[in-house]
Swiss-Prot record:
It comes from Thiobacillus denitrificans (strain ATCC 25259 / T1). It is found in: Cytoplasm. Belongs to the GTP cyclohydrolase I family. QueF type 1 subfamily. Pathway: tRNA modification; tRNA-queuosine biosynthesis. Its main location: cytoplasm. Its EC number is 1.7.1.13. This is NADPH-dependent 7-cyano-7-deazaguanine reductase. The gene is queF. Pfam families: QueF. Gene3D superfamilies: 3.30.1130.10. Substrate binds at residues 56-58, 75-76. It catalyses: 7-aminomethyl-7-carbaguanine + 2 NADP(+) = 7-cyano-7-deazaguanine + 2 NADPH + 3 H(+). GO terms for molecular function: preQ1 synthase activity. InterPro entries: GTP-CH-I_C/QueF (IPR043133), NADPH_dep_7-cyano-7-deazaG_red (IPR050084), QueF (IPR029500), QueF_type1 (IPR016856).
Length: 139
């Protein structure tokens, strides 16, 4: 597997496709460029999903996230683009991407984008676990 930025997301078979289970990931070092100023934007991305038949492979996810480092994107655009790419690669039952951008001009921006597979309904009372953030960048 390469160790340079890549737009390719690799997957592996869900080990328990008959069960809904929650996968939680944090990407505390996401960077892209502001399309207006060219200055770097930094964010912590929080990915929560319930896989269907495939799970995203972690190293490919890291290299995919790294591929945005030199690209200009508005916060709302990049969050939705990443979600769309992850959904296209994994076809999850449910996926939520939360992007917590660091302060810019005195304003923190959080963008939350969600996908729900057509026809999928969670079992009654599915509460997604709240994980303590491991990043020291923002609470």
């Amino acid at each position: 597997m390469p160790s340079t930025p890549s737009k390719t997301l690799e997957t592996f078979p869900n080990p328990k496709p008959g069960r809904d289970f929650h996968i939680h990931m944090e990407v505390p070092e996401f960077t892209c460029l502001c399309p207006k100023t060219g200055q770097p934007d930094f964010a912590t991305l929080v990915l929560d999903y319930i896989p269907n038949q495939a799970c995203v492979e972690l190293k490919s996810l890291k290299l995919y996230m790294w591929s945005f480092r030199d690209e200009g994107h508005f916060h709302e655009d990049v969050t939705n683009r990443i979600l769309d790419d992850l959904v296209a690669a994994t076809d999850p039952r449910y996926m939520r991407l939360t992007a917590k951008f660091y302060v810019r001009g005195g304003i923190f921006t959080n963008v939350v984008a969600e996908h729900r597979k057509d026809g999928w309904q969670p079992a009654p009372r599915v509460d997604l676990t709240q994980f303590e953030h491991q990043s020291n960048t923002r609470g």
